[in-house]
């Protein structure tokens, strides 16, 4: 989940980072989720391994978007059990889900949601996309990547 924090810091977005367990601290989970709106939270990124009930439980207790990050753990099936648990939510309890251990993409998705109401953040995301585009094309500056004949 540290990767999510790094992305949020890079974009200058205020955030909080805490630990809540659906199974070990259910009272804390309920209080956190039920007070999220009144505390001004706009998106919650919830990482969970194993049974991964945390993102779904949070989504069932609040109306703000929840992004689930399946986490590979020592007692999981390479994170696949976590992924399946998070994506198989019942109708009416939506949880957006990213790839296993991909907290960075969870943060980027959260930023896109926030950017709908924040033009400055929207422009930062556009600049980020442009940078990714340029980085992807950078190897083409190497003459070894140019071909005289079409590949097909």
Predicted feature locations:
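Short, ordered loop/turn segments at secondary-structure junctions
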Residues: 20-22, 49-50, 71-74, 100-101
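C-terminal binding/interaction regions
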Residues: 78-152
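Glycine-rich phosphate/diphosphate-binding loop of Rossmann-like nucleotide-binding domains
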Residues: 1-24
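Active-site-proximal loop->helix
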Residues: 5-10, 29-33, 77-90
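Glycine-rich phosphate-binding loop
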Residues: 32-71
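Short glycine/serine/threonine-rich phosphate/pyrophosphate-binding segments
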Residues: 1-2, 26-28, 48-57, 76-80, ...
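N-terminal beta-loop-helix "entrance" segment that forms/cooperates
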Residues: 17-39
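Glycine/charged-rich beta-loop-alpha catalytic/anionic-binding loops adjacent to active sites
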Residues: 13-16, 40, 64, 87-95
């Amino acid at each position: 989940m540290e990767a999510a924090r790094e992305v949020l810091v890079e974009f200058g977005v205020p955030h909080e980072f805490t630990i809540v367990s659906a199974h070990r601290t259910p009272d804390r989970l309920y209080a956190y989720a039920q007070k999220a709106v009144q505390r001004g939270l706009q998106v919650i990124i919830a990482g969970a391994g194993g049974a991964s009930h945390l993102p779904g439980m949070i989504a069932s207790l609040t109306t703000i978007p929840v992004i689930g990050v399946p986490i590979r753990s020592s007692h999981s099936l390479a994170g696949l059990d976590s992924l399946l648990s998070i994506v198989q939510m019942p109708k009416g309890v939506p949880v957006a889900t990213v790839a296993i251990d991909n907290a960075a993409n969870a943060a980027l998705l959260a930023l896109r949601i926030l950017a709908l109401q924040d033009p400055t953040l929207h422009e930062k995301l556009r600049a980020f996309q442009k940078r990714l585009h340029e980085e992807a094309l950078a190897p083409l500056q190497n003459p070894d990547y140019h071909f005289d004949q079409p590949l097909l």
